[in-house]
Amino acid sequence: MRVAVDAMGGDNAPVVEVEGAVAAAGEFGIPVTLVGDTDRVNQELAKYNCKGLDITVKHASEVVGMHDSASDAVRKKKDSSIRVAFDLVKNDEAVAVVSAGNSGATMAAGMFVLKRLKGIDRPAIAQIFPTLRGKTLVLDVGGNVDCKPLHLVQFAIMGEVYARFVMGVDNPRIGLLSNGEEESKGNDLTRETSALLKNTSLDYFGYVEGRDIFNGIVDVVVCDGFVGNVVLKLSEGLAEAVGKMLKDEIKQSLLSKIGYLLSRKAFVNFKKKVDYSEYGGAPLLGIDGVGMICHGGSNAKAIKNAIRFAHEYAQKGVNQRMAEKLQENYPLYMQQLEMLKVQAAG
């Protein structure tokens, strides 16, 4: 099962993409196709001993930049590295795409080339967060800034399946992000979504607050892409700031430095737990295929792990399970949605 990597996406392309691909092929035995400028990609590959590694290169003459519109990836730049990568999946030459490029363009290309899963109106970008009890999946973290209750219910179903079959959670609990735990809190979007979620087969916990993401009281947290992206960027900034503050404090005295040396293993383990590169990338859920969106500043380790997770996602047939779960729940939440419409009209 081959993974296609957008070798020209991201701040450090194609350097980190090539290094990450070589590492994934070497450590995990995953076949990889690097998509991009053949000359530049081969120049980077020449730095490594790739003997015995299943790595191929597919030429793409165009690149979608970070400031290009999402539509450019689909309509204007048909030979862009991200578009060609998804074409490989469509033509059964790969099972997944990994890209650290323009996330909007990646999402648009995935939807245009591979289409959406049956029962999905809008795909969502999901992100794993480290918690006090393990891990929590949050979605949407940036794919859709304006959502309807129906979209959030679909996000919850996709998140439940991903948590169960990729994260290994036996019975995932679903929480809806709000400004308080009480049912009286929230806005029209969360209140209507909550009513729909209660009418599904999911283990719906109810409202959760922002702090609960890191407490780990639920396994999946659902929100619209506007709120989710704020949560994501806030957590990234906080982790970076805390790390710098800690370093500054350690430098203040000899005693602090000695304390750090004695506790170094704990610090290393903590850093590993909050390091985004450990999780690779954010899965694009809801397209009829596998797409992994990486941070624009991803290092080789992040690319390597994104390839691993994308390969695992495809291996486990998660999309088929999502389609089945969506079909199972469709009549349940649609019945409730019709009731809410009648109440609103009356």
UniProtKB/Swiss-Prot annotation:
One of its GO terms (cellular component) is cytoplasm. Its EC number is 2.3.1.274. It is an enzyme of class 2 (transferase). Its main location: cytoplasm. The keyword Transferase applies. It catalyses: a fatty acyl-[ACP] + phosphate = an acyl phosphate + holo-[ACP]. HAMAP family: PlsX. PANTHER family: FATTY ACID/PHOSPHOLIPID SYNTHESIS PROTEIN PLSX (PTHR30100), PHOSPHATE ACYLTRANSFERASE (PTHR30100:SF1). NCBIfam families: plsX. Catalyzes the reversible formation of acyl-phosphate (acyl-PO(4)) from acyl-[acyl-carrier-protein] (acyl-ACP). This enzyme utilizes acyl-ACP as fatty acyl donor, but not acyl-CoA. This is Phosphate acyltransferase. It comes from Geotalea uraniireducens (strain Rf4).
